[in-house]
């Protein structure tokens, strides 16, 4: 074999394992990380301003997954915070609140299914997001609340799944809205949309 041909063959033989290893590594990385959803946040756009919440999938994976799914479907868009108790929490996520004629039934709506409770060690402090439910621990669906005070008596009895990282002033504004019978706000507090976005897109 000519010297040049021999050198070329040796070079190809040396490089092939390198290319193969690089391709294999890239395929493994793609397989292991098809889509990074652990670093996502929720942008809760309301008639009073925007709030941004981070998630706790390490302690409430199914709850976080359900909330993100509903948000991506536009389920929460056009709903309202229908129950407000200053110093305690603001509650929303009921699809019935899209219809003013169903006001008497507000607080009873759901997505048509229930999810299992994921009680955990996260404490209910100001800004924490948690799932609303009935007396049945496994009755949460879509309704959630954001703590205004520090209702730690709810710990390990309600599924905390995230907390606000921006918009505390909006929480304060909503929580101090004047209310009437049934803790209903006297003016409508719209949830215009809830969008799931990468955390690094938030400034």
What are the functions of these language-model segments?
Residues 9-21:
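Bacterial N-terminal signal peptides
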Residues 20-203:
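Cyclophilin-like peptidyl-prolyl cis-trans isomerases
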């Amino acid at each position: 074999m000519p010297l040049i041909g021999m050198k070329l063959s040796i070079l190809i033989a040396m490089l092939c394992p390198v290319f193969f290893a690089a391709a294999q590594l890239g395929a493994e990385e793609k397989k292991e990380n098809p889509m990074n959803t652990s670093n996502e946040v929720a942008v809760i756009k309301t008639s009073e301003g925007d709030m941004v919440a981070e998630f706790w999938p390490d302690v409430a994976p199914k709850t976080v997954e359900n909330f993100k799914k509903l948000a991506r479907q536009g389920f929460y868009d056009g709903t309202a915070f229908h129950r407000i108790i200053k110093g305690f929490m603001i509650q929303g996520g009921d699809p019935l609140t899209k219809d003013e004629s169903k006001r008497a039934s507000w607080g009873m709506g759901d997505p048509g299914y229930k999810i299992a409770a994921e009680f955990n060690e996260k404490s209910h402090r100001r800004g924490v997001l948690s799932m609303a439910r009935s007396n049945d621990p496994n009755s949460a669906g879509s309704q959630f609340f954001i703590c205004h005070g520090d209702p730690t008596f709810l710990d390990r009895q309600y599924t905390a799944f995230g907390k606000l990282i921006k918009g505390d002033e909006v929480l304060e504004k909503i929580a101090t809205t004047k209310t009437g019978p049934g803790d209903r706000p006297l003016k409508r507090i719209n949830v215009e949309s809830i969008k799931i976005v990468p955390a690094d897109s938030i400034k």
